[in-house]
Amino acid sequence: MEQYSILGRIGEGAHGIVFKAKHIETGETVALKKVALRKLEEGIPNQALREIKALQEIEDNQHVVKLKDFFPHGTGFVLVFDFMLSDLSEVIRNYQRPLTPAQVKCYMMMLLKGVAFLHHNNIMHRDLKPANLLISPSGHLKVADFGLARLFSNQGERLYSHQVATRWYRAPELLYGARKYDEGVDLWAVGCIFGELLNSSPLFPGENDIEQLCCVLRVLGTPTQDSWPEIVELPDYNKITFKENPAIPLEEIVPDTSSQAIDLLYKFLVYPSKQRCSARQVGNRKWSPGPEVMFSRVRVQ
């Protein structure tokens, strides 16, 4: 720790405090995440271990935050990351400078590239949300916070916790208690983030799990066995019933948006997980959320 000079406190998460620091020898500005162990006998928290393991599993990628180092410190340890100026939630909430269609597209392209890279490496993030998408001083978006990340298998036999993902971005199968799921939970979250970029507010702002499900059903309509055959296999399917509700066109939920962007939103926000368009597929498509803008000409300030 003595090789770093603390410049200030950035924030605090469930398992640690994040500081802005400078490496004394190189002058590089970094972010230090200090994780304290409440009891030595309990060892390193599972979420911290998952974050380290996930970031060690993947190679450097310009759209995934880099774990530069980690080392023991006192009764805990420190993770060293690239320093990032802000996060996407701060960008969205900046009402003085609303996002332009070109900026929405730029951020989405970077998000899709990061998620495609993770899924190619068999990693489910399981907590994608604007606050976990960090923005570098140069404007690059990077996926961060891998405390809930898990390696996944295409065999589909492994059981996972359904208590993952921040509620507003939680896929409907998780809200119905699914223990067997795939990277589609990340793709649903990508759709929610996309809608929030377009609308400057969350698409499904539920205050509890039941209300969250109601928010989704109110927009996408009540699912049936025809529209979502797997729903009858979900653990909580028979625990609560909803009256039949027709879908509301997304054009009404996200007004003043191009037909291409609406079409893309529909490809993420679909009930059956297997029908959600992969990040790699979308990254290869040509689309525009508004005026025709070439991605190569977009520079995020």
Describe the function of each predicted region.
Residues 66-75, 85:
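Short beta-strand micro-motifs within the conserved protein kinase catalytic domain, predominantly
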Residues 107-108:
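Activation segment signature within eukaryotic-like protein kinase domains
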Residues 17:
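Conserved N-lobe ATP-binding subsite of Hanks-type protein kinase domains
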Residues 222-267:
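C-terminal lobe substrate-recognition/regulatory segment of protein kinase catalytic domains
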Residues 29, 34-60:
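Conserved N-lobe beta3->alphaC-helix segment of eukaryotic protein kinase catalytic domains
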Residues 160-174:
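Conserved activation segment of eukaryotic-like protein kinases, specifically the C-terminal portion
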Residues 119-136:
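Catalytic-loop of the protein kinase fold
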